[in-house]
Amino acid sequence: MHTILINKLMSLKQRFYKLEKSLNNFNTINNKEFYSLSKEHTYLHEIIKYFEEWLNIQKNIVHTKDMLSDIDMHDIVQDELKILNTSKHNLENKIKILLFSDPQDQYNCFIELRAGTGGKEAAIFAGELFRMYSRYIEMQRWNMEIIHATYGECGGYKEIIIKVPVHGSYGQLKFESGGHRVQRIPNTESQGRIHTSTCTIAVIPNIPNAILPEINSNDLRIDTFRSSGAGGQHVNTTDSAIRITHIPSGLSVECQDERSQHKNKSKALSVLKSRLYAINIKQKQQEESNVRRNLIGTGDRSDRIRTYNFQQGRVTDHRIAFTSYKLHDIMNGKLDILIQPIMCKHQATLLDQLTREK
């Protein structure tokens, strides 16, 4: 582990025990301060627990290495060192994940997929990305629900919004936000020409209602209409589908998944609130640091983050110049092939920033 990071953790350890002392003397602090200190203490608790385990293992490694000179014990000591080093490495990964996590990483999320340029082919591509995420979610043993879907004329989706109600799913999937581009020969192409189509993804944290700001009802316009299925046919005889527009920002959300107008309204409002919250958070982050903007992207749908080239069987993530030739596996849900490298790069970038600040 980098010396700068160890020094940072030593500093956090001192802070953690100082917090414990203050919280034990709760009569000397008011309720608001107690809540704030408790929140910080909870955040540091797991980090310090793993760090203290790491320090103990580090001591054991030094002590065990001293025994290598004993010829009779050499093989046993080597095996013990392998076990200790594996444990040490695992703890370092856990510490980095906790230390460099975003406060919103703990939340579940919405994934919005929208077909971009490319017409019918873009909608088909959006459908394939939806299948990719569905398979990934299934592999993680998570669950999901469709909030809203507008079907493409030849299959796929013009737009689809899904909810992944699993703790920490936002932190796992947030790097998917941005523009996804596909290069391939469509089935409808008779001359064998490669076409380029795009789909935009937005991964939004589903913030608990207790944290979300209230929206003035006068700022909302609510429209009702009949739900429609693939091909545009109406699948409901009542106006159960809902469209909510936030007038000041111009943001709008549709929901037609439920037969109940009340349930559709509740779901649409939840998505709208999360979108507005995400925009506010993004603005603050852009003011504070370039790290997120450079690596995760601005969240702007025009950011091209990834290209899927079917002719060459490759996927390239442009943010970290990473290319994999396992396109088939990725499209079948093995998304960790792409997620893990960018998460590692993100941690390395934050550590580098920490070093420069030091």
Curated annotation (Swiss-Prot):
It is found in: Cytoplasm. Keywords: Cytoplasm, Methylation, Protein biosynthesis. It comes from the Bacteria. Pfam families: PCRF, RF-1. SMART domains: PCRF (SM00937). Methylated by PrmC. Methylation increases the termination efficiency of RF1. The keyword Repeat does not apply. GO terms for cellular component: cytoplasm. InterPro entries: PCRF, Pep_chain_release_fac_I, Pep_chain_release_fac_I_sf, Prokaryotic/Mito_RF, RF-1. One of its GO terms (molecular function) is translation release factor activity, codon specific. Its main location: cytoplasm. The modification N5-methylglutamine is found at residue 233. PANTHER family: LD18447P. Belongs to the prokaryotic/mitochondrial release factor family. Peptide chain release factor 1 directs the termination of translation in response to the peptide chain termination codons UAG and UAA. This is Peptide chain release factor 1. It comes from Blochmanniella floridana.
